[in-house]
Amino acid sequence: VETSFVPMDFLTANIELLDEKKAQTTYKIEYVSKYVEKWLFVMSNVDEVKNINFIDCMCNAGIYKDGDKGTAIKVLKLFNDFALQHTDKTFNLIINDISPDRLRIITTIINDYVGVKATNINIVTRNMDVNAFLSDEEFFKKYFNCYPKRSSNLVFVDPYNFCTVKISMLEK
């Protein structure tokens, strides 16, 4: 278990909006982070790929009650490491959550505590229901078609509420 990277007063002030972390959540974050790291290693070394997109469809607050980082924050830290080494690529972290309060928390964490140093990272936030978000074709075209056949995209839908996701939206 890692030490919280945000001040205790920030955690305390937002504790009612944060989730308890279950054992399977720890494993999920670990597995997704390891997968993303391997994906980034491969895609950032493919000359033709210029645009690397990670989309977290239900990002939550970015932190848990115990102070551990959520998936989107872990991915952002990986993006920062890879973006500093691969300045010819653009890294887009697209995060969505239905709760404006949780988006406020994750945005504050990103802006105040993560310490992104790479200038080739874009962070885009959306406040939508997961199905409305996934069906917003114009939005996704903007990121997926920036460089025809030159984007690598990873869409993450947390299995926590996966039963609410319309699979047909992912197929598009």
Each predicted region: which residue ranges?
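Short flexible/disordered coil segments
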Residues: 6-13, 111-123, 160-165
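Active-site segment flanking the S-adenosylmethionine/decSAM binding pocket
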Residues: 125-172
